[in-house]
């Protein structure tokens, strides 16, 4: 990504969007260089031409839902039928937000500076452990601020609702598409 003259932050976002496969990164960088034709790198412009990984698209859609911008999310789900991917991602995001909110209710204050946050995260990393793995601090850092749009109790009940919806879809009690659509409506109804 240094060939494009991008900031470290934009380089990280670009890798997050296109994936970590070195061959794909090389191809995407070539495509971007040709597209820019010597102009400055602008991430929003580049997003239009890169081949974005499905996981990143789901992450973006979930972020839209959690920030109360659901029209794009509903369109995405209608086109792609990625209901379970979005459900699993919502579950993970809401669970992490609940943990952040709980720590803040206990008086913990997280820095808005990433380098300071990384050091703070070491103290709480076990709390965020999922399936035996500690997430990268940046993954948790990106959730800071979004959790403020929900009460701690709402986050707790939404985490439980995600689990219920997944269980009921898997046991055949609920139909996938309307169940996830209704869950999204529940989430936005809790938005402050």
PLM features per residue range, with description:
Residues 57-66, 70-192:
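C-terminal alpha-helical interaction modules of replication/initiation AAA+ assemblies
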